[in-house]
């Protein structure tokens, strides 16, 4: 794979996937680390370890299967840790990470998760993905309210470029946005320090009570809110890869990196959609290049873990929101079409879409999981009724 031979839109898709992933949740990771009692140096080490783990897993799986397999930390899992790690020592937190990732590996080895994912209808997977991504589209246009000049200009340039050179529309929007941000003086880079940071090994401390109260919920949240949507998103995009090996590999890698602060590495859904979209590459079989590029950017982000938070703080939130919305627009539209195309499955797909988009959280598990459950129940009930009426 030669970077110079990869089309610019494909390079941009890989870059945006990493940028949006970090921008949307890096702060939550830092907050969870602070709750665990980590020092600034240790937190930087966590970010380094996470970047390296995601980079290695993304590159390995993508190059091996030649499909866009993007991995990511579990944002819902990080949010759970913000409250779950309160009262625990840093060593106990590391013990929780190890138990969680060991459970993920066990789940992958048994094949239970793969069998579950095979029975999910394509329309429900697409509806869930559309529900996950909807907020990014809404945030993009809501950002016009506070930053009309910046976001309005990005939108107009995107529209004009989309009409004449569709593959370069997001690039053009990003460039004009950067120009306006610099012109307005909205970039503050004083906190950005580009210096490689080595991860710090932390001795784990295991507790049965903490395994039940924190590790088990973290395992469930990671599988239900990260891996399930990630596999379903890949399925909705028309890609197939053996589920169990994906889960086992990411779980094992996270297990190895756990003593350095990696609490989980799962299959990405939101950011993966950028690499799986037509904007990444018109040829569906070449979109794996975008994920491979994302893997390289993950590694770079890992090498400079201490600079990540400063970089995210330097960019206006509205710029990131508009860029994310524009990059995901085609994927949202395509997912909605796939979800609603089959009239017999339409009602169940709408339920899955709305529950997922609602942001519902029950027993610490996010709306993507409950969207699949609600849509699945509707699918089974409505199809049973339809079959009974037919006979």
UniProtKB/Swiss-Prot annotation:
PROSITE patterns: HTH_ARAC_FAMILY_1. InterPro entries: Benzoate_Transporter. This is Inner membrane protein YdcO. GO terms for cellular component: plasma membrane. It comes from Escherichia coli (strain K12). Keywords: Cell inner membrane, Cell membrane, Membrane, Transmembrane, Transmembrane helix. It is found in: Cell inner membrane. Residues 31-42, 115-123, 189-200, 268-287, 333-361 are periplasmic. The chain crosses the membrane at residues 10-30, 43-63, 94-114, 124-144, 168-188, 201-221, 247-267, 288-308, 312-332, 362-382. One of its GO terms (molecular function) is benzoate transmembrane transporter activity. It is a multi-pass membrane protein. Residues 1-9, 64-93, 145-167, 222-246, 309-311, 383-391 are cytoplasmic.
């Amino acid at each position: 794979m030669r970077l110079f031979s990869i089309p610019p839109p494909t390079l941009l898709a890989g870059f945006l996937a990493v940028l949006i992933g970090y921008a949307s949740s890096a702060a939550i990771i830092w907050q969870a680390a602070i709750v665990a009692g980590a020092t600034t140096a240790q937190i930087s080490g966590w970010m380094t370890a996470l970047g390296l783990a995601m980079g290695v897993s993304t590159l390995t799986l993508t190059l091996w299967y030649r499909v866009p397999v993007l991995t990511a930390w579990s944002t819902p899992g990080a949010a759970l840790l913000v409250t779950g790690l309160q009262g625990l020592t840093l060593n106990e937190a590391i013990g929780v990470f190890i138990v969680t990732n060991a459970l993920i590996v066990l789940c992958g080895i048994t094949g239970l998760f793969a069998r579950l994912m095979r029975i999910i209808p394509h329309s429900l997977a697409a509806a869930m993905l559309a529900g996950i991504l909807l907020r990014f589209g809404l945030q993009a246009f809501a950002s016009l309210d506070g930053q009309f000049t910046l976001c309005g200009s990005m939108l107009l340039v995107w529209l004009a470029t989309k009409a004449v050179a569709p593959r370069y529309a997001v690039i053009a929007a990003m460039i004009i946005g950067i120009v306006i941000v610099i012109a307005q003086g909205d970039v503050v880079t004083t906190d950005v320090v580009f210096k490689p940071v080595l991860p710090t090994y932390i001795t784990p401390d295991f507790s049965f009570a903490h395994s039940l109260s924190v590790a088990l919920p973290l395992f469930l949240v990671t599988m239900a809110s990260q891996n399930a949507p990630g596999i379903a998103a890949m399925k909705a995009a028309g890609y197939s890869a053996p589920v169990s090996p994906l889960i086992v590999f990411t779980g094992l890698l996270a297990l190895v990196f756990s003593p350095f602060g990696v609490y989980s590495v799962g299959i990405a859904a939101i950011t993966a959609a950028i690499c799986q979209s037509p904007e990444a590459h018109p040829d569906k079989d070449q979109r794996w290049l975008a994920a491979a590029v994302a893997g390289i950017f993950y590694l770079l982000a890992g090498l400079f873990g201490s600079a990540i938070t400063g970089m995210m703080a330097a960019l206006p939130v509205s710029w990131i929101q508009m860029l994310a919305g524009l990059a995901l627009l085609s994927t949202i539209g395509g997912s909605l079409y796939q979800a609603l195309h089959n009239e017999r499955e339409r009602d169940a797909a709408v339920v899955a879409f709305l529950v997922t988009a609602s942001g519902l959280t029950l027993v610490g598990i996010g709306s993507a999981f409950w969207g699949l459950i609600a849509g699945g129940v509707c699918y089974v009930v409505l199809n049973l009724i339809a079959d009974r009426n037919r006979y």
